[in-house]
Amino acid sequence: MRKIGFFGLLSALLLTLTTSCTSSESKISELTIYSGRTEEYIAPYFAIWQRESGVKLNIRYGDSAELAAQILEEGKNSPADLFISQDAGSLGAVAEQGLLTPLPKDVAEGVPAKYIQGNREWVGLTARVRVFAYAPDRVKVLPTSFTDLSKPIYKDQVAIAPTNASFQAFLTAVISNKGLPFAEDWLRKVKANGAKIYPKNSAIVEAIDKGEVSIGLVNHYYVWEVAEALGRPINVKNGYFKANDLGNLINVSGVGILASSGKKAKAEDFINFLTSERIQSRFVSDIHEYSLLENISIPEDLPPLSDLGAPNIDLEVLKNTKKTQDLLIKVGLL
């Protein structure tokens, strides 16, 4: 009797523990997200998730590079369950230190492999193309390469945003592809050619519209964004360099799950939500970024990604931002 009673009690205890673990996973009521995407653009999708899933999202917004540095400092003690970044470089820096967990193959199934980190530690959400924005009535000779912007024809007319993560990602690609001496020489020439410095991409587009400058390096959606904010057409268009030019870099926003998270299953559900056709279509219509899903339409009035002549750059190299930042400091642009 005692023997039967012991095993009966043990079985009941194991069943209780198993049920408790399953129940605790299914009843997760909160996820903590570090978001390098600004609240203005990403919060509406967070609201949809919270309403439909019943799971509250605790969001910490900030610059992607700064949030990556915060995660590196916190290490395995980070309270974050997910890290959303506006660029691949910041995700790569965190993944390199083993702080992101590989995603199962049934997560983000529709995203092409080239937009997923090799070990599946992060996945792309949207594509963002580097372009030159310009005033069509003032720029009569369009540049064919980013290197042209140091030429006398563009003296005192070029704008850049050295503190911006997207500019730094582009410069990181230049360093990786052309070497540090080449990148330094180009930066010094652009600076000597009278390049104007702005804090962010939208400020560059606004400056072109106001006539302060005539051409600037930005991401593709800022012309649309500024026109939307002003509620009127602006005197700015997107331009593209020749095929395979590094100035046509395609970067991605993306997301990864912290290895230290105890809520991985629910975090995976959230990634599947962000990479679903419904939300990907909203990214296109709401914020004018390219979906990474092949069956989703492209943003209005923009060419397909396949027509842009983007350079063949492994997004993994974009994590090497320290050399880039050191170079910008060296030439006096940071």
Sequence positions of predicted segments:
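Extracytoplasmic ligand-binding site segments that recognize negatively charged/polar headgroups
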Residues: 36-43, 62-66, 78-213, 246-249
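An extracytoplasmic/periplasmic, membrane-proximal ligand-sensing/linker region
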Residues: 289-334
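A bilobed periplasmic-binding-protein/Venus flytrap-type ligand-binding module shared by bacterial periplasmic
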Residues: 131-138, 250-263, 282
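Short, polar/charged alpha-helical segment
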Residues: 35-57
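Periplasmic-binding protein-like
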Residues: 156-161, 273-297
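A ligand-binding cleft/hinge motif common to bilobed small-molecule-binding domains
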Residues: 89-93, 214-235
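Bacterial signal peptide processing site
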Residues: 22-24
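C-terminal motif of bacterial Sec signal peptides marking the signal peptidase cleavage site
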Residues: 17-20
